[in-house]
Amino acid sequence: MRGVRWAGIIAAGEGSRLRKGYPGLPKPLVPVAGRPLVHWVASSLRAAGVRHLWVLLNSRGDAVRSALRRSAEGMRVRFLRRDTASSWESFRLVSRALAGEAPRFLVSTVDAIVPPADARRFAAESGARWGAAGGGRGPAAALGLTRFVDDEKPLWADLDASGRVRGLGEDAVRKRAVTCGLYALSAGAAAKLPGARRHGRLRDFWIDLVRSGAAVRGVMLSKTVDVDRPEDIPAAERVIRCFDA
């Protein structure tokens, strides 16, 4: 698929593990390689072709607005403001806003450092149709995956030969890749999202979606980093130094 022009950033989390190193600073504004964390996420989405961006902030995230507007040149940026109860509720809220405008869209967590080249490839491959063996249809959703694992609680994923996700979490057997905080969803799939209280975590939604038999594509990316802890920042900065090198 080419030309994904809509995306969302989930930037409403508390960032509790980063707080000890950056007290009083909202997670999206934590500096990484001299720029706010949210800058790198927005820049990679822009490189993927995104021109319309929805950003979810919590009630303490107002300072993020001006920082993001400076980093999102060429994109129309709109904000949602909500103190959500879970990562699932946040994803659902952003997805439903996007589904009213776009046939397919990307969603990223604010802590996902993904090289621009990988973001472009994810946008291109996340909606590509399967061959005749797969019925010639496109996936309902897609997950960005990486083999770089440096997370306390990684969500493992198993793929078949066609790139379809066959198992997540405890259902994964081979455990050769993990999710990285970058997602794609069709408007049709977004219209069928369960209620905000159905899941306590975003990963629970994805596990259930794969178990239901829905066509979910896994797109293998290079080295990506989730910035959850102060000790993740050096790894993220090493990845950033290689952006489009």
Which ranges hold each PLM region?
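N-terminal nucleotide-binding beta1-loop-alpha1 segment
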Residues: 1-23
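Short acidic/polar active-site loop segments enriched in Thr and Asp
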Residues: 5, 51, 103
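Short catalytic helix/loop segments, enriched in acidic residues and glycine
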Residues: 24-39
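A short, N-terminal amphipathic alpha-helix
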Residues: 35-52, 66
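A conserved acidic beta->alpha catalytic loop
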Residues: 57-62
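Conserved beta-loop-beta/alpha segment of the NTase-like Rossmann-fold superfamily
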Residues: 64-66, 72-159
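Catalytic-core segments of class I nucleotidyltransferases/pyrophosphorylases
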Residues: 123, 127, 131, 164-245
